[in-house]
Amino acid sequence: MPAAIRPMKKTVSFSKDVSNNNNNLESDSDTKQSPQSYLTFIPQIKNSLLVVPFHNIFILVGMFYSGLTQDLETVMWKGFLTSIPIQVIYNYIIYINLLPLKKSTRNDHQNNSSGSAINNNNNNNNNNVPLLIGSSIFVSIVLSLPLFVVIILMGAPVYKYSLKTLYLSLHLSQLIFNPLIILSNLNVNKIKRLFKQDHLYRIIFHHGILSSVLLTLGGCWLGVIPIPLDWDRPWQQWPITLLVGGYLGGVVGGVLSLIVNYFSH
């Protein structure tokens, strides 16, 4: 008689699947940003009240007092020159109000897209402060040229208005790029990493500098609205309302950050 064929026992192993799932979970957790990973590359502010750009109001009032609506180009240029030493003082106030960076975790180092971890030991004491502040002014002036091109591409009038638009870009570059350069310590990768964070707007409005910069852009954008209205007022000239919106937007952004931080605590 032929030998009876014994049925084979079927076994199912989940060990490989479980191990694969565990590996996938670990990789997913590595790719996710930690809740406060931005603290490892964006310095926080000691006293948010001190970095609110209230000086913007005085610069703006000074330009109107000097005849901004009568001699627009001359007053805008003189106002820009006047704002530079004021901005130098403001940059120093920002610098001395920056807290040391939080130490990076393993995941924060892995998520650094540039492939190099940020050295948190390079605190404020290791910086050449005059060089940093001077560089922020110079770089901001240089960046006013691409900003000028962007404003033109977004619909700014060109014929007979190019010089006024250039002066507008000079003012806006000081309001936008100057504080960001001090905050990032001339490291563009820090700003790039900021846009990869979850809850970006929550981070921005909890930070006095970032909130001021964002509302400067928003105020300038809203400043376009009164220009085409049929009111025939001298202050409706291009680009006075954009200039006013940018300067006041920075102040509103700083105050808004104070309010957000107050209620969040």
From Swiss-Prot:
Keywords: Endoplasmic reticulum, Glycoprotein, GPI-anchor biosynthesis, Membrane, Transmembrane, Transmembrane helix
Membrane topology, as annotated: Multi-pass membrane protein
Pathway(s) it belongs to: Glycolipid biosynthesis; glycosylphosphatidylinositol-anchor biosynthesis
Residues bearing carbohydrate: N111, N112
InterPro entries (alphabetical): GPI_biosynthesis_protein_Pig-F
Gene Ontology terms: biological process: filamentous growth; GPI anchor biosynthetic process
One GO location term (cellular component): endoplasmic reticulum membrane
Domain of life: Eukaryota
Places the protein is found: Endoplasmic reticulum membrane
Statement: the UniProt record of this protein carries the keyword Glycoprotein: yes
Membrane-traversing stretches: 49-69, 79-99, 137-157, 166-186, 209-229, 240-260
Function: Acts in the GPI biosynthetic pathway between GlcNAc-PI synthesis and GPI transfer to protein.
Family: Belongs to the PIGF family.
Protein name: Glycosylphosphatidylinositol anchor biosynthesis protein 11
Species of the source: Candida albicans (strain SC5314 / ATCC MYA-2876) (Yeast)
Gene: GPI11
